[in-house]
């Protein structure tokens, strides 16, 4: 009976099992080696993957799951974004000061807190949630920022990998859902037009290339609209 139940698990359920197992391992790492240099990056990777899985769950609950065409368009837009960010960041010289250094400095502070202990790092992230959500973002941007040279441009580019995929998936689900509500006849062209137009909206990328990951909040906004 157990083997039959295991075979009936969906990919999302398997993802949930995997995330749960990784959470246990992370908890053990935090207890046994609280100042480990690997804890914060691994926790960040786990959080980003978990958020992506939750986004897929939101699409399923809303009845707006993506087909092969939708996934291909989303991947294409993401690939264009990677090239765009790389070209923009490598072809300019920008000094990250004032507000433009705010998130970058918070990321440094989060890394310093986790270098003390896992408890100190978690206290830094969640201790100010009632007043300021910006510390929470550092949980998701640490990976792959931890693999870079820790510059402002590196922080901006890291968002393409830790924030944009989940954001695009939810945006795609929202476009699909609106198309269902409006009973669009040619849903393929509608989706292509809707995704291209929305993803090209300048305010989705202008602050991101300036090391301000405020578009992270749109993930929760899109999920709420879907549900």
Residue ranges and their predicted role:
Residues 90-108, 115-143, 150-153:
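Extracytoplasmic catalytic/substrate-binding loops of multi-pass membrane glycan-assembly enzymes
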Residues 157-184:
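Transmembrane-helix motifs of polytopic, lipid-linked glycan transferases
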Residues 190-199:
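Short helix- or helix-capping micro-motifs
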Residues 36, 40, 69, 150-158, ...:
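Membrane-interface starts of transmembrane alpha-helices
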Residues 1-86:
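Start-transfer (signal-anchor) and selected internal transmembrane alpha helices
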Residues 203-216:
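Short acidic/glycine- and proline-prone juxtamembrane loop motifs at membrane-interface regions
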Residues 32-37, 83-102, 209:
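Helix-to-loop transition at the C-terminal end of transmembrane segments
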Residues 216-227:
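Specific aromatic-rich, kink-prone transmembrane helix
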């Amino acid at each position: 009976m157990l083997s039959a139940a295991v075979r009936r698990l969906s990919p999302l359920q398997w993802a949930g099992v995997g995330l749960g197992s990784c959470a246990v391992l992370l908890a053990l790492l935090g207890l046994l080696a609280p100042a480990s240099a690997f804890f914060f990056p691994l926790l960040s990777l786990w959080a980003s993957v978990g958020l992506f899985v939750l986004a897929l769950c939101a699409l399923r609950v809303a009845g707006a799951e993506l087909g092969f065409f939708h996934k291909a368009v989303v991947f294409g837009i993401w690939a264009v974004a990677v090239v765009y960010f790389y070209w923009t960041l490598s072809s300019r010289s920008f000094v990250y000061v004032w507000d433009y250094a705010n998130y970058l400095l918070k990321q440094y502070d989060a890394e310093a807190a986790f270098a003390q202990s896992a408890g100190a790092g978690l206290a830094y992230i969640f201790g100010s949630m009632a007043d300021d959500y910006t510390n929470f973002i550092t949980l998701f941007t640490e990976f792959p920022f931890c693999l870079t040279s820790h510059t402002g441009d590196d922080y901006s580019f890291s968002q393409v990998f830790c924030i944009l995929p989940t954001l695009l998936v939810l945006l795609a689900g929202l476009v699909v859902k609106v198309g269902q509500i409006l009973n669009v006849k040619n849903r393929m062209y509608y989706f292509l037009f809707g995704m291209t137009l929305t993803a090209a909206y300048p305010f989705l990328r202008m602050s991101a290339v300036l090391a301000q990951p405020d578009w992270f909040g749109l993930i929760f906004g899109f999920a709420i609209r879907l549900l």
